[in-house]
Amino acid sequence: MGFLEDEDQKYWDDVQAVKAWWKDSRWRYTKRPYTAEQIVAKRGNLKIHYPSNDQSKKLWKILESNFEKKVASFTYGCLEPTMLTQMAKYLDTVYVSGWQSSSTASSTDEPSPDLADYPMNTVPNKVNQLFMAQLFHDRKQREERITTPKDQRSKLPNIDYLRPIIADADTGHGGLTAVMKLTKLFIERGAAGIHIEDQAPGTKKCGHMAGKVLVPISEHINRLVAIRAQADIMGTDLLAIARTDSEAATLITSTIDHRDHAFIVGSTNPNLQPLNDLMLAGEQAGKTGEELQAIEDQWIAQAGLKLFDDAVVDTIKAGVHVNKDALIKEYLTAAKGKSNSEARAIAKGITGVDIYWDWDAPRTREGYYRYQGGTQCAINRAVAYAPFADLIWMESKLPDYAQAKEFADGVHAVWPEQKLAYNLSPSFNWKKAMPREEQETYIKRLGALGYAWQFITLAGLHTTALISDQFARAYAKQGMRAYGELVQEPEMEQGVDVVTHQKWSGANYVDNMLKMLTGGVSSTAAMGKGVTEDQFKH
């Protein structure tokens, strides 16, 4: 067999291996609009095993079990390795927040609010820092345990430091090739899963800010496909989480996808000029700031802005029809899921008139269409994303159980096996939202609805700020007493391993490596005679 035949045989062997991989139950709900042949053709000759693939498999196993049992894994945004090692004792996953990274860990070191305007390697870099710490502390612990006699080993901690990391991919930081490159970075740096949201990249906002602009459903599906394709090229089981910001969105970039049409807002006043024409005329007349805002406010007040379905319902109600309720039901049933042009034809057939409704007239100065979000809107998008996503997350304004149930029920009516995620956001005022008894059971109640993974995005930031404020305030007044009472004594009482920070940092582990290299003796061992950490021995 010649070189060309060998080359073809290897290619077809790889294709068959990919086809067999895709038959695994892991992919029973996953839709791929490409072939194994196309994926293998994009691979190089050197097969690389990515450690993150083991973590992805581990994460999937956790979430499969959670969904089956109707329980949840819950975690929070981790800032740095110290926090990571403490989380590993109690929580089975780790979250890496784009918000936290934007404010504390940009690769340019320039802090920013959560606008995803930091370089695209920022969050992957944070994942890498945490994953490297996981590997190190796992090695350190294993060395200590395996060199301890069996009869004493049970007294030692046995912490699973290798908790799967789920990270924030924002909107993908650009077009589809940018999404693929970002996905590649995350896989290389150790992420088990990533989430990506359906906002427009240039105007991305924190999920709890105003002014969110969506992309069409089809565009976000393309992003999800790009993530899966890149993971397939790299041979990994990376989890893709689809986030929708449509519950509170007010704008959308395009009307190209008919699945968005029912939620786009139009003007019902035929006597008005398009808003942008008036705004442009105002600018040319020298108006600025509040004067331009007044023009927009007046136009909106007169425009009769509403959804096309609402315009049809209002037309039927205002007409001379005898059976108005029946006609409304007939229209809404027939128009559900249809494009606007199809809905117009249905409406004319029922009402006998061409209803004036113009979605171009209210467009913003940036060209965006006005949009009316909400829970049903989010369900509409989630149902479309489900075949391409392992989990789905609806960003919401409040921790509202009834809304969470409405969303879960709406998605599961179409996709019963769809796993869901939930942001237990610190942007919510939890004290106002529900009593403490309900706070305590909220995660469990959501888990029963299928929210298999839940997370507090910024708990790492807030807990760090809280203890830093408490300690700095007390330290300024009480000096070292504050350190003893607020930090060291509680560390010792609660058995926090960082109290012996030299050992926590791996000094014993490194000493033993040096001794291995030098025949068992090292006069420069960091933990030798004279180390101050001996003060903490019992």
From Swiss-Prot:
Its cofactor is Mg(2+). One of its GO terms (cellular component) is glyoxysome. Pathway: Carbohydrate metabolism; glyoxylate cycle; (S)-malate from isocitrate: step 1/2. InterPro entries: Isocitrate_lyase, Isocitrate_lyase_ph_CS, Pyrv/PenolPyrv_kinase-like_dom, Pyrv_kinase-like_dom_sf. Disulfide bonds: none annotated. It is an enzyme of class 4 (lyase). Its EC number is 4.1.3.1, 4.1.3.30. GO terms for biological process: glyoxylate cycle; tricarboxylic acid cycle. It comes from the Eukaryota. Pfam families: ICL. Substrate binds at residues 97-99, 207-208, 243, 423-427, 457. Keywords: Glyoxylate bypass, Glyoxysome, Lyase, Magnesium, Metal-binding, Peroxisome, Tricarboxylic acid cycle. GO terms for molecular function: isocitrate lyase activity; metal ion binding; methylisocitrate lyase activity. It catalyses: D-threo-isocitrate = glyoxylate + succinate; (2S,3R)-3-hydroxybutane-1,2,3-tricarboxylate = pyruvate + succinate. Gene3D superfamilies: 1.10.10.850, Phosphoenolpyruvate-binding domains. Mg(2+) binds at residue 168. It is found in: Glyoxysome. Belongs to the isocitrate lyase/PEP mutase superfamily. Isocitrate lyase family. Homotetramer. NCBIfam families: isocit_lyase. Catalyzes the formation of succinate and glyoxylate from isocitrate, a key step of the glyoxylate cycle, which operates as an anaplerotic route for replenishing the tricarboxylic acid cycle. Required for growth on ethanol or acetate, but dispensable when fermentable carbon sources are available. Also acts on 2-methylisocitrate. This is Isocitrate lyase. The lineage of its organism: Eukaryota, Fungi, Dikarya, Ascomycota, Pezizomycotina.
